[in-house]
Amino acid sequence: MNQSALILTHFDKKSEYDAQYIDNQNIDLKSLFERISENKLAQTFVSSSTTPKLSLQNIKRGVRYIKAAGGLVRNAQGDYLFIKRLGKWDLPKGKVEDQERMKEAAVREVEEECGLKIKRLGAKIQSTYHVYSMHGEVVLKKTNWYAMDVDGCPPLVPQQEEDITEAVWLPVHQLSIVRENTYPLILDLIAGLDAEQ
């Protein structure tokens, strides 16, 4: 939400975060999104609950909910795949189709968006949530991210109809290029890659 974060947690240590605290019974994602959109400043909101998963279920009921899947893809040289979509560095991902499993969607989307063939689908890295407005409607998108590998260093073909203008392989020591122009959720996903150097 405009680089802001809503943290649903199970503990109640208000000193842990420099944040605004929200009663978990009164989280209205639409209203919160409008407030953040008007303010334009990145903010952190925290809601503490003994049942954060139940709080998430309640939030999902009030907005359009989309499932997506994507990948953090590594080639045989140890370089990672990044795409530039709408002027920002990102990872390939896309919407899960009806009757499609998350893992299947992740592989399909990466292959479609970058014109390559995934050799191995690894473990789920994590799930992220992203809120945005589409056609005047507030959308909550959950994305499952998976580790993936390809043979060799295949050429990349960015899917331009998905607003992807570049697809590149980057070694870990060049990830500062991505960090300077990406989203906070992508920063979280690639945070552990520095240990590979």
Label every PLM stretch briefly.
Residues E16-I22, R74-E112:
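Conserved Nudix-box catalytic region and its N-terminal flanking loop in Nudix hydrolases
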Residues M1-Q3, H10-D18, P155-Q197:
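Nudix hydrolase/Nudix homology domain
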Residues M1-E38:
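N-terminal leader/capping segments at the start of a protein or of a new domain
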Residues N26-G70:
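Acidic, metal-coordinating catalytic segment for phosphate/diphosphate chemistry
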Residues V96-Y183:
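Unchanged
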Residues G70, D79, E166:
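Conserved beta-strand and immediately adjacent loop positions that scaffold enzyme active sites
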Residues R64-A69, L86, K141-T143:
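Short connector loops at helix/strand junctions that flank enzyme active sites
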Residues V73-R74, A147:
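Conserved hydrophobic "DFG−1" position in protein kinase catalytic cores
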